Amino acid sequence: MKDRDVNIKFKKDPVLLDKMLQELQQKLMESLPWLNVAFGRAYKLARHDEGGNKFLYPAAYNGKSEYISLLPNDSFGNFSWFDIYDPQEITPISQALPQYTFNGALVFWYNLDSIYEDNDFVYTEEIKNEVLRLLTTPGIVSGASRLNITKVYERFENIYKGYSLEKIYNNWAYKGEGVAAYDKQFFMHPYAGLRIEFNITTRNLCQYYTK
């Protein structure tokens, strides 16, 4: 199901992190036919309720000062997004060519019924296998760069690691922000997700510093 307008645009001459993520976004869309939307970097936004509680959630920038929530939903089909961690590291390999390293995660949320006609089994391992095979393909990142997969998370609270959904579930505090509705609708078959943590090390992007 897709009922939300999503505005995916790419910078003409991206640098550094934007360059790496745009390349990966494009390869995800080209290689995964079941993926409806490949978002770029997510940003951590906050909602405040009348009781003073703060709810943190990931959101993608959609242009014109608009953000789209990336919490579990069926508004724009199967989707992915990047969660990038601080800090990003720069190692002075040489004055003209420092090494740039960043860590993050690629998150997928999808509806199995939209991918497989057979619902007698749960096909999350097949999805995971397909994604990992793509991400470990030689040349998946360009130039003098290397992508390393470090961890894979599949439990719902871990997929949204670093956001309020993780805290709510780990503290057994099932209240607020429609969490009960998420339980009944999105945290069971046919919905599923993946959080694939990675690091990317590159040198060629930092050449822009020397211009």
Place the predicted regions along the sequence by residue:
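Short, flexible beta-strand-to-coil junctions
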Residues: P87, N111-D113, T201-R203
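Hydrophobic side chains in beta-strands
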Residues: I84, F108, I196-I200
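Short, charged interaction patches at domain edges and termini
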Residues: M1-A38, Q95-Q99, I149-K211
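Extracellular/virion structural assembly segments
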Residues: I93-T101, A105-K151
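Polar low-complexity intrinsically disordered regions enriched in Ser/Thr and small residues
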Residues: Y43, K54-F55, E66, S142, ...
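A broad, low-specificity signal marking well-ordered, structured residues that form hydrophobic/aromatic
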Residues: F79-S80, G104, I196
